[in-house]
Structure formats: C-alpha cells, structure tokens
From Swiss-Prot:
Its EC number is 1.1.1.267. HAMAP family: DXP_reductoisom (MF_00183). This is 1-deoxy-D-xylulose 5-phosphate reductoisomerase. 1-deoxy-D-xylulose 5-phosphate binds at residues 125, 151-152, 179, 202, 215, 220-221, 224. Catalyzes the NADPH-dependent rearrangement and reduction of 1-deoxy-D-xylulose-5-phosphate (DXP) to 2-C-methyl-D-erythritol 4-phosphate (MEP). It catalyses: 2-C-methyl-D-erythritol 4-phosphate + NADP(+) = 1-deoxy-D-xylulose 5-phosphate + NADPH + H(+). InterPro entries: DXP_reductoisomerase, DXP_reductoisomerase_C, DXP_reductoisomerase_N, DXPR_C, DXPR_C_sf, NAD(P)-bd_dom_sf.
Length: 395
C-alpha cells in the first residue's frame, strides 16, 4: 500500500488528489492531511480517509478539529504550525508527498519532503520559483523523486525522453501553453474595471481564487516559465509561451529535427495527479477521454505583453536570477491579495510587482535564509506600494 501525505488537502489540487485516491483505495492510503483554516472540510476528509496525522495552521483550528474528530470517533493525531507541516512532509511513514499549498507558505514543507528523499508531487510552483537551485540540489543530494503536477510541466515531462527528463541536446525549446484567461480578447483599456469575481471566472479550469487571478494576469504562466527553467534546465530564450484558448494541448517540446511532441487531454487536474501518483504506470483518473472530433479547431497565438505585463516581468526576473524570482512572487502575492479584498484595481497588480522588482536588490540565492529575507523585504515594499496606489477600490 502506497502511503500519501497531502499538503493543502482542502484546496482544489488536494480535493482532486483525494478523488483519485478514492478511486484506487486498493493501492493508496492517506497518511497525513493538512489545511490552514478550512477545518470543516479537513474534518470531513479525515473522517473518510482516516489519516494517521492532520495539521492545521493555528492552535484554535487544531482544537476545533480535535473536537470534530473526537465526536466522530476518529483517532487522527492533530497538530498545528510550520514545524508540524515540515514533520508530516518528512515523516518516515509516508512514501509520496503532494505539495499543494498555495504560495510561499508551501516552500519549507516541500523542501523538507525533498530533503527526506520523498517522492514529491510538485503542485506548489512557488517552491521552485523562490529557491530553484536550493530545491533542485536537495532533490539530487537526498535521492528524492520529483514529479511535476502542474498540467504544463507534467505535459513537458511526458514529452521528454523517458531516460532523461532534463533539458538536453536534441531539444530545441519547451513550449508552455496558456488559455489566456478570461480577458484574452478584452480591450486592454478596460482592464482597470475588472472585479475580483470576473478575474476568478476562468473559462476552462476550476481553481482557487489566487491562482485564478494569476491566470487572468498571466503571472501564473510567468511563474511556470521560471519553474520550467529549473525542472528542465531550459534557459529563458528556449522557453516559449503560446496562447491556446481551448486548453486541450497542455504543452509541447520542440526538437532540433523539426519534431514537436505534445500532450493532449481534457482540462482536468486529475490527469496529471493520477500520472504523478502512479508513475511510471497509468491509472484511471476519472477523466473523460478526449474526443478530438468534438474538440474542434485548436488555436494558438503569441501572448500580448501589453495586455499581460506580468508575463514580461516574470521573464525579467528569470533573466536577473538570484533572489529576483522570489521578489517577483512575494510582491505578486501581496498585490493579488489586495485586489481580492477590493483594495486595488486589477491593473495595479502588475504596476506594484514591477515597482518592487525594479527597486529590490537582486542578491544571490545562496541559502534558504537569503531567499526568505528577500521574500519578506519584497512583501514590505509591496505593502508600501499599496499605500501609494491612488486608484479607487474595486467594488
């Protein structure tokens, strides 16, 4: 029985992972589940899957969860806090760790899993964006297995040679596809009027609010560009982004002989999740098979960097190197949260991120401490920028 820990069990990736596990109860057992504050949802999953351990964000949430599980007669051990997250991620009793905590909060536990030599199913792109070299060194030094779960990187992983998943001779470039989000054809002059609800209404994917906004700005694709650099060793000039509104082609690898290999499928995160769980086998993910006769035309176009300045900022951060990607991510997290709370306009997100990236010192990312310090300084700078934003709050 393969034992799994799910970091971020109440988010969209966590819930999709549990759905796949539910379909294969004969081969997977849940060892630990974590959530920050969604105690009711976590309790329901603990009652169903009976994990040995559960972790929440605060002592208050832990007390609430313990009470709910006690009433249900479930003896899951409950703990809270960052140290507890790192503990379950590196627990000797778990085989695979689904790293699905959104944002910088997922960095430490995901790194702990790598350092413990786990099979890491990486859905938390920020771990690589912030600490790419540190993270990849940990994977190599401790014998961890790293399997990308983002649909784009999972697609590239599948399209690279089976005996060498790194970016090697013979590969001309990797191509990340992007839906373009809900504003792909909207007049850029009207983007300042976008509301949080509009930004979260993705045309193809069901996702959490933060990643939905990142998709709308294309910062999500920018972060994926940085992630692809570290996963596959691809320099910025060998990473291309194409808008593909149908979200059927999840990404491609172009080879020097003119061949292009692509991975296709219906837009459902259970496909890459099932791939990561069972690799190198294939299992039923509960996803309807792709019918190309119904899919119709598949369109591709270059991204408009006037409409999507966040994508250009991400390429800038990748080329700058060092802690610049961590600065980019931190500033974006602060700006997106402010937008979701109605404090700034949609177009202020890129403006704030650009200002912070321009002003921040771009030191080397030599240690986790350097990365986390850059993260905190960038957040402080972004919050200062919020005070300077003169646009009225979105309502």
């Amino acid at each position: 029985m393969h034992r799994i820990t799910i970091l971020g069990a109440t988010g969209s990736i966590g819930e999709s992972t549990l759905d796949v596990v539910r379909r294969h109860a004969d081969r997977y057992a849940v060892h630990a589940l974590t959530a920050h504050r969604q105690v009711q949802k976590l309790a329901a999953s603990c009652i169903e899957f009976r994990p040995a351990r559960a972790v929440v964000g605060t002592s208050e949430a832990a007390a609430e969860l313990e009470a709910l599980l006690r009433m249900a007669g479930v003896k899951t051990e409950v703990s809270h806090g960052e140290a507890a997250l790192e503990s379950v991620a590196s627990d000797a009793q778990t085989d695979s760790v689904m790293a699905a905590i959104v944002g910088a909060a997922g960095l430490r536990p995901t790194l702990a899993a790598a350092r413990a030599g786990k099979r890491v199913l990486l859905a938390n792109k920020e771990a690589l964006v912030m600490s790419g070299r540190i993270f990849m060194d940990a994977v190599r030094e401790h014998g961890a297995t790293l399997l990308p779960i983002d649909s784009e990187h999972n697609a590239i992983f599948q399209c690279l040679p089976a005996n060498d998943q790194r970016y090697r001779a013979g590969v001309a470039k990797v191509v990340l596809t992007a839906s373009g989000g809900p504003f792909r054809t909207r007049d850029p002059a009207t983007l300042h009027d976008i509301t949080p609800d509009q930004a979260c209404a993705h045309p193809n994917w069901v996702m959490g609010r933060k990643i939905s906004v990142d998709s709308a700005t294309m910062m999500n694709k920018g972060l994926e560009v940085i992630e692809a650099h570290w996963l596959f060793g691809a320099p910025a000039e060998h990473i291309e982004v194409l808008i593909h509104p149908q979200s059927i082609v999840h990404s491609m690898v172009a080879y020097r002989d003119g061949s292009v290999l692509a991975q296709l499928g219906n837009p459902d995160m259970r496909t890459p999740i099932a791939y990561g769980l069972a690799y190198p086998e294939r299992i039923d993910a509960g996803v309807s098979p792709l019918d190309l006769t119904l899919a119709g035309a598949l369109n591709f176009e270059k991204p408009d960097l006037v409409r999507f300045p966040c994508l250009a900022l991400a390429f800038d951060a990748l080329r700058a190197g060092g802690v610049a990607p961590a600065v980019l991510n931190a500033a974006n997290e602060v700006a997106v949260e402010a937008f979701l709370q109605g404090g700034i306009r949609f177009t202020d997100i890129a403006r704030i991120v650009g200002n912070v990236l321009e002003k921040a010192p771009h030191g080397a990312a030599d240690s986790l401490e350097c990365v986390l310090e850059a993260d905190q300084l960038a957040r402080q700078s972004a919050r200062a920028c919020l005070q300077d934003v003169t646009t009225s709050a979105v309502r």
